[in-house]
Each structure stands twice: as structure tokens, then as C-alpha cells.
């Protein structure tokens, strides 16, 4: 549905141009929710605005719904943009128009007949749960309701793609969950392809099928959300995940491990960080490892979460025993689908 090929984008700057995007390659499949996450200034907004050519890339090609946007004339590009809806962080509603009229605006500008506009807007307001507020003005509704108006307006022309530019970052957590739930419902009910950018890994966790991590204008990692959570490869990804699934051990735990090392240096053991997902999360693997390999195992830290219906868990464990048994235990865990990260106790 969307393909970005070797995209670079620079802005004028002094003493040298600012490189916002560098060699970006992305492919978004039809009907999926694709997230792009990164810190402030990483290039997220620049990237999403390249998709509909609000930012024209300095280099590369943009393909959306079978058309190469970067090769289109101005008039053909305007027509192609009808296939791409967009919602924004600050809603961008017209304060002088009612909820109904804000949603109707793109249809009016396209010359749609009034009777068809009324039918389409009624349908959309029902979809986003705002039929009762149709005559209200933006100043009379909440932030979450304003974003629902923005979503309805973005869907007015029946686009194939919806772009979400930090659409929930100005909302409280409960309203954010509600808006993300609405986007997921629209995606599932209508097969709409959604690309959303965010700096919050919680948003990715709740709604995205796949995710790309952007850092300093480059895509540093991408994949299925469950895979990225369980097998993060890049330091930026690990730090973003750590914000919602912290891995830092309490100082009291670190002190206890070091005391064990000092008391029994010949059995100082090993610190393992384990990540598991799906069916593996329900299997009694640790008790099996203890029995099979004769190890002492102490759980230091752990948590279990849910990523769109898939159980995901992480554990930090201190394992002590013979070196050969430790090696075999790690191999056994990995063969069972557990992601195992070995750490030196001295570096904890």
C-alpha cells in the first residue's frame, strides 16, 4: 500500500542544511496499523509528511496505493491525496463551524452534492459516536471529542490510508486509549491502512501491528511489535521499551547479589534476562530448568503484560550452579523460544 524508497529530506540551515531523513526505506502493507516511534527531533513528523508529500523529499520515491506520488503533476497529486486522510495533534478544527460542518468541509470543497454530504457526515458522526453533538462548536466539546471530529473529517472522502501525526499526545491516558480503540476498530471494520507516529511506546503496544524505530533521521529497527518488544536490537529501541517495561534492578537487589558473590565466589553464578511471548509464557520452564540441570535460581525482577492479546513477559533471574549446567540451561531456554540475555554480575 505504501512504499518509501531511499528517502532523504533536508531543510535549509546555517551554516549547513539540516538532514531530517537519511536513506529511509519502508513498506506498509495494505490493511495494517504501522507505527513509527522515536524521540523528539528524530524525524517522525518529517517522515509522515513525506507520505502525502506535504514534505517533498530531496531524494527517493513515494508510492501510495499504486501511484508514485513523487512523479505526479500538481493536479494529479491533488487527486491522489483524496486517498490519504490525516489527523493531527492539535485537531485543526475551524472554530466557526459546527461539528457537522467541520466533517462536511472536505466534501464541500470537492463539490459533492448536499444530499450526499448529509448522508456521509451522518454516517461518520455515528461511527465516531458524536451524532448527539453535531450542532456543537469546537469550543463546546472536549479534546477527545475534537479528535473524533478530526478522525471523521479525515475519513470523509473514503481514503485508503489514514496518517496519524501524534494524534493522542495532547490527550489524557483514558482518552488516548479510547481514541486508539476507535482507530483499531476502523482499521478492522474497513480494512483501512493506518500509519501513526508517536513518541510513546504504550501507543505502539496498544494498536500497532508493526513498528519502525527512527533515530536521527534513520530507521534503526523495524518489525512486528511483539518481536521488537521481545528482541530489541538497537539502543534506542531498548530505551523506549524500558519506559513502559523497566529493566533496572533495585539497588537492594544488586547489593544482595554482590553479597552472594563475596560469600561464595566459586558459585557467583550468572544474571539472565529472559523475555518470552505467546504460548511460551504459560509453560513452567523455570521449574523444569531447576530440576533438569540442578541449579539454584532466584527471581530478582519480573512482569507480565499483554500486547494485543499476546502475553509478553520479562524476568531477571540470578542462576547459580556448575558452568556446564548453566550453559545447557541457557541453551534449553532458547530452544523453548525464550530470549535470553546473559549479563556479567560485576556489570550489574
UniProtKB/Swiss-Prot annotation:
Gene3D superfamilies: 3.30.70.260, P-loop containing nucleotide triphosphate hydrolases. Pfam families: ABC_tran (PF00005), NIL (PF09383). InterPro entries: AAA+_ATPase (IPR003593), ABC_transporter-like_ATP-bd (IPR003439), ABC_transporter-like_CS (IPR017871), ACT-like_dom_sf (IPR045865), MetN_ABC (IPR041701), MetN_ABC_transporter-like (IPR050086), NIL_domain (IPR018449), P-loop_NTPase (IPR027417). The keyword Cell inner membrane applies. It catalyses: L-methionine(out) + ATP + H2O = L-methionine(in) + ADP + phosphate + H(+); D-methionine(out) + ATP + H2O = D-methionine(in) + ADP + phosphate + H(+). The complex is composed of two ATP-binding proteins (MetN), two transmembrane proteins (MetI) and a solute-binding protein (MetQ). The lineage of its organism: Bacteria, Pseudomonadati, Pseudomonadota, Betaproteobacteria, Burkholderiales. Residues 2-241 form the ABC transporter domain. It is a peripheral membrane protein. It is found in: Cell inner membrane. GO terms for cellular component: plasma membrane. Its EC number is 7.4.2.11. Belongs to the ABC transporter superfamily. Methionine importer (TC 3.A.1.24) family. Keywords: Amino-acid transport, ATP-binding, Cell inner membrane, Cell membrane, Membrane, Nucleotide-binding, Translocase, Transport. The gene is metN. SUPFAM superfamilies: ACT-like, P-loop containing nucleoside triphosphate hydrolases. This is Methionine import ATP-binding protein MetN. ATP binds at residues 38-45. One of its GO terms (molecular function) is ABC-type D-methionine transporter activity. It comes from the Bacteria.
